[in-house]
A protein has these predicted regions:
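Universal eukaryotic N-terminal targeting presequences
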Residues: 1, 25-28
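Positively charged n-region of N-terminal signal peptides that target proteins for export
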Residues: 1-8
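C-terminal motif of bacterial Sec signal peptides marking the signal peptidase cleavage site
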Residues: 16-19
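Bacterial signal peptide processing site
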Residues: 21-23
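A residue-level marker of the well-folded mature domains of exported/periplasmic proteins
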Residues: 27-29, 34-376
Length: 376
């Protein structure tokens, strides 16, 4: 766990916020990584060993895209390979496939993508390019529709409920009694985060005998930062909500704006967001860069074909693989300690602490001590 947290911190400190411009369908940025991982602008046609195709965001989003790209860069830097990233010109399957085509034309041995929106594109591209290895983070087998992952595809999902549980438990143990969960869309990863958060908060409340813990729970219906979300969060904070777990990419920007305006706090998601938002007390994180590096290393060591560890299957990573957690070194807890965290983490790893991983939006987690207000 300490290795994972150190990795997250190092990656966070190393990332720059240089934007990638360009609006052509073949936009690509190259990183020659024999000795450095500094990106330099390039046109499609440059040599590519490993490609990263972004989702609707960019590589400076301080979230999923940025840390996934960091994983690609780290891997290529360590192995004297060339990395390119490709940004679709619009949010469509056709645009995503077009950038995959560009990556293959540039010589990519492997293409990395992140997010469930890539399901249809992966389902088509894996058959179109059987010699290219596709690594898809946060894409489940179900996201591929009626297609199954082929031997050249590795799907990685995460046990978000474990990270959410740790965040909920720590917040309540630390003394917060009025909590909120702001989800983007009610997709499996977001639901698991939220349900884990509820379970953790309930467990802590029961342990410390707090019968007055409340959670407001709401899905905004999208991942964009909007005035609607900010207004909703303004209402929560002004009504007494102390901290909100904001789970849904850019939607956290609206939550942070409301938190700042009302003196509230926020829990970040996916990556350590303490450097991005002063309101963040902790973050429920995934080991994005680390899992990218491990999967690509697996393919490279097997002649650029995934081994049976990843090939044609969905691999779920959690505490046992050091791929979810809280960045305790940057967390702003006053009561919840590193020792408590380590003990709880070990209990999750060895199975002593079991956390419900269901993600049915219509079936809420059972609670014994807290009150949850599910809002629509």
């Amino acid at each position: 766990m300490k290795k994972f947290l150190a990795f997250v911190m190092a990656a966070s400190m190393a990332l720059s916020l240089a934007a990638c411009g360009g609006s052509s369908a073949s936009t690509a940025t190259s990183t020659t990584t024999a000795a450095t991982s500094e990106a330099a602008a390039s046109t499609s046609g440059s040599k590519t060993d490993v490609a990263f195709v972004t989702d609707v965001g960019n590589i400076d989003d301080q979230s999923f895209n940025q840390y996934t790209w960091q994983g690609v860069q780290d891997f290529c830097s360590a192995n004297s390979l060339n990395a390119n990233y490709y940004r679709p010109t619009e949010d469509s399957d056709a645009a995503r496939l077009e950038q995959m085509d560009n990556a293959v034309n540039d010589g990519a041995k492997s293409i990395v993508v992140a997010g469930y929106l890539f399901g249809n594109a992966i389902a088509e591209a894996q058959e179109k390019y059987p010699d290219v290895q596709f690594l898809a983070l946060d894409v489940s087998a179900g996201d591929l529709g009626d297609k199954a992952p082929t031997a050249n595809t590795a799907l990685i999902t995460y046990k978000e409920e474990q990270a959410g549980y740790l965040a909920g438990y720590a917040a309540v143990y630390d003394g917060y009694k009025e909590l909120g969960f702001l989800g983007g869309m009610a997709v499996p990863a977001v639901i698991r985060y939220g349900y884990g958060f509820v379970q953790g908060a309930d467990a802590a409340a029961k342990e410390i005998g707090a019968t007055d813990v409340n959670i407001k729970y709401w899905y905004s219906g999208g991942f964009a930062a909007t005035d609607e979300v900010k207004n909703k969060m303004d209402g929560w904070y002004s009504e007494g909500t102390e901290v909100v777990f904001a789970c849904g990419g850019p939607v956290c920007q609206s939550c942070d704006a409301a938190a700042q305006a009302n003196g509230g706090k926020m829990i970040g998601v996916d990556v350590d967001q303490s450097g991005q938002f002063d309101t963040v007390i902790t973050s429920a994180t995934k080991g994005l860069a680390e899992s990218v590096n491990e999967a690509l290393t697996d393919a490279m060591n097997n002649g650029w074909k995934f081994s049976e560890t990843y090939s044609g299957k969905e691999t779920k990573l959690g505490a046992a693989e050091n791929c979810v957690g809280l960045p305790m070194s940057t967390s702003k807890f006053t009561k919840f300690t590193q020792e408590q965290y380590d003990s709880m983490y070990a209990s999750i790893v060895d199975g002593t602490l079991a956390i419900d991983d269901s993600y049915d939006a219509d079936v809420k987690p059972a609670v014994t001590t807290i009150t949850v207000d599910y809002q629509s």
